[in-house]
Amino acid sequence: MNTLIIDTTYSSCSIAIVTADMNSNLTFNNSNNQQSETITEVLLTTLSKAKKELKEISSIIVTNGPGNFTSIRVGASFALGIAKGICAPLYSLSSLEFLSIFNEKNKFFNKKLISVMPSRGNEIFVQEFSDSSLSDSEMLKIKNSDLEKEFSPDKYFISFCSFQKENLNLYNYDFIEREFEDMSLNLVSKVKKKKINLTELK
């Protein structure tokens, strides 16, 4: 089972292939919201790193936001085209859900988890998670300055993507800085163990 994971939620394009023996191969391109021009090259580079052909992909996972609508559509359309072309199942999850998936118990077990990613201006997307469910609560869009009012640093720790740290004000929080490659491995591991159920797109 080789899983292709595509993310165009941010201004960049990230593609990972997690192989049957749980090796991860990642390509990242800081495309500055020009994913449509770079996504094919990113895929081909990742396939080359993994030493796989497209026909060897058994399932595809694509993130579905939140974020720039055009960027999200590029990733979803690209993933759907591949899925239909190779007759592979296509699944989706939000980027906030993706950030919430850990293969092992996190080190801040005494606090609740929130996934955070920047929106436009001084706003951020936030969602709370627990170990028992992929998504426990509704996603919120709030001002960065209101984060501590809504989610006390004494009660919550934060998961965020590594290349977005500079866009977030997290000084008073315990946090875990996530790498896309590790996130991909954690996601596939959880799916294999049937600990999470993803939405299938058809």
Q: Where are the language model's segments positioned?
A:
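Oxyanion-binding and handling regions
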Residues: 1-22, 36, 91-202
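N-terminal beta-alpha supersecondary unit
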Residues: 1-64, 157
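DPxDG-like acidic metal-binding loop motif
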Residues: 59-95
